[in-house]
């Protein structure tokens, strides 16, 4: 099991983290309108998969807003932000924060943990048990993993520059 920290305290992650060059595993998540989507729904596009515990935390909110700003203008790239929030909370967050880019989709895994388990970000213990650790994956148009960042301390932001560079390189 992979370990990360939450405020300096170790937590275990469940699942196998895909490596660059691996075929990305499919997953299911729920949009704000309660419809289900999967990775296959974004076939043929470069994807930035952003795993966050909850949009109601300050770091997750900052991260989602940052990816909305940094990736929204890149034609051919879709950002999928996956969290444990209910779709209603995601809708409220996006509305309040002015996040309405068609290139950024929020997805809830409240019904199904297939994303966090397939991508090795499922928190197995500690106070955030059942949520996803903070991570970023970039997939090319054929769903091959091109970039992976498992953020070692859950309360810190990822490397936006590296993720955006990987997405641009995958175009």
UniProtKB/Swiss-Prot annotation:
Gene3D superfamilies assigned: Glutaredoxin
A Pfam family of this chain: Redoxin
Active site: 60
Catalyzed reactions: a hydroperoxide + [thioredoxin]-dithiol = an alcohol + [thioredoxin]-disulfide + H2O
Superkingdom of this protein's organism: Bacteria
Gene Ontology MF, one: thioredoxin peroxidase activity
EC numbers for this chain: 1.11.1.24
Disulfide bonds: 60-94
Domain Thioredoxin: 18-169
Function statement: Thiol-specific peroxidase that catalyzes the reduction of hydrogen peroxide and organic hydroperoxides to water and alcohols, respectively. Plays a role in cell protection against oxidative stress by detoxifying peroxides.
Assembly mode: Homodimer.
Miscellaneous section: The active site is a conserved redox-active cysteine residue, the peroxidatic cysteine (C(P)), which makes the nucleophilic attack on the peroxide substrate. The peroxide oxidizes the C(P)-SH to cysteine sulfenic acid (C(P)-SOH), which then reacts with another cysteine residue, the resolving cysteine (C(R)), to form a disulfide bridge. The disulfide is subsequently reduced by an appropriate electron donor to complete the catalytic cycle. In this atypical 2-Cys peroxiredoxin, C(R) is present in the same subunit to form an intramolecular disulfide.
UniProt record similarity statement: Belongs to the peroxiredoxin family. Tpx subfamily.
Name assigned to this protein: Thiol peroxidase
Organism: Leptospira interrogans serogroup Icterohaemorrhagiae serovar Lai (strain 56601)
Lineage of producing organism: Bacteria, Pseudomonadati, Spirochaetota, Spirochaetia, Leptospirales
